[in-house]
Amino acid sequence: MKFSALLPVFFLLLVVGDEVQAIAKTALKVLPQLFKRSVVRKREIEEAFDLHQRDLDFDKLLSQLDFN
Protein backbone atom coordinates (compact mmCIF):
# COMPACT_ATOMS: atom_id res chain seq x y z
CA MET A 1 0.00 0.00 0.00
CA LYS A 2 2.86 2.38 0.69
CA PHE A 3 4.31 1.67 -2.74
CA SER A 4 1.10 2.63 -4.51
CA ALA A 5 1.00 5.91 -2.56
CA LEU A 6 4.64 6.71 -3.28
CA LEU A 7 4.45 6.00 -6.99
CA PRO A 8 2.31 9.08 -7.86
CA VAL A 9 4.47 11.24 -5.59
CA PHE A 10 7.61 10.00 -7.33
CA PHE A 11 6.04 10.61 -10.74
CA LEU A 12 5.02 14.15 -9.74
CA LEU A 13 8.53 14.85 -8.48
CA LEU A 14 9.95 13.81 -11.84
CA VAL A 15 7.50 16.00 -13.74
CA VAL A 16 7.97 19.00 -11.43
CA GLY A 17 11.74 18.53 -11.47
CA ASP A 18 11.77 18.57 -15.27
CA GLU A 19 9.60 21.69 -15.31
CA VAL A 20 11.84 23.46 -12.81
CA GLN A 21 14.91 22.54 -14.84
CA ALA A 22 13.28 23.83 -18.03
CA ILE A 23 12.27 27.08 -16.33
CA ALA A 24 15.78 27.51 -14.93
CA LYS A 25 17.36 26.98 -18.36
CA THR A 26 14.98 29.48 -19.92
CA ALA A 27 15.63 32.01 -17.16
CA LEU A 28 19.38 31.66 -17.58
CA LYS A 29 19.01 32.48 -21.26
CA VAL A 30 16.47 35.29 -20.91
CA LEU A 31 17.64 37.20 -17.84
CA PRO A 32 21.07 38.25 -19.13
CA GLN A 33 19.46 39.57 -22.31
CA LEU A 34 17.03 41.64 -20.27
CA PHE A 35 19.80 43.17 -18.24
CA LYS A 36 21.85 43.90 -21.33
CA ARG A 37 18.94 45.65 -23.00
CA SER A 38 18.19 47.73 -19.93
CA VAL A 39 21.81 48.79 -19.65
CA VAL A 40 21.87 49.74 -23.33
CA ARG A 41 18.63 51.69 -22.98
CA LYS A 42 19.96 53.46 -19.93
CA ARG A 43 23.11 54.46 -21.81
CA GLU A 44 21.05 55.68 -24.76
CA ILE A 45 18.89 57.79 -22.46
CA GLU A 46 21.93 59.20 -20.69
CA GLU A 47 23.63 60.02 -23.99
CA ALA A 48 20.50 61.71 -25.31
CA PHE A 49 20.18 63.72 -22.11
CA ASP A 50 23.84 64.70 -22.21
CA LEU A 51 23.53 65.92 -25.80
CA HIS A 52 20.41 67.87 -24.92
CA GLN A 53 22.09 69.31 -21.84
CA ARG A 54 25.11 70.35 -23.89
CA ASP A 55 22.83 72.11 -26.35
CA LEU A 56 21.10 73.92 -23.50
CA ASP A 57 24.41 74.93 -21.96
CA PHE A 58 25.67 76.17 -25.33
CA ASP A 59 22.46 78.15 -25.90
CA LYS A 60 22.76 79.63 -22.42
CA LEU A 61 26.36 80.62 -23.11
CA LEU A 62 25.40 82.22 -26.41
CA SER A 63 22.58 84.14 -24.76
CA GLN A 64 24.97 85.44 -22.12
CA LEU A 65 27.42 86.55 -24.80
CA ASP A 66 24.73 88.30 -26.79
CA PHE A 67 24.98 91.98 -25.93
CA ASN A 68 21.88 93.14 -27.81
UniProtKB/Swiss-Prot annotation:
It comes from the Eukaryota. Keywords: Antimicrobial, Cleavage on pair of basic residues, Secreted, Signal. Expressed by the venom gland. The keyword Secreted applies. The keyword NADP does not apply. Residues 1-22 form the signal peptide. One of its GO terms (cellular component) is extracellular region. Belongs to the non-disulfide-bridged peptide (NDBP) superfamily. Medium-length antimicrobial peptide (group 3) family. Probable antimicrobial peptide. Shows low inhibitory activity against herpes simplex virus type 1 (HSV-1). This is Antimicrobial peptide Eval162. The lineage of its organism: Eukaryota, Metazoa, Ecdysozoa, Arthropoda, Chelicerata.
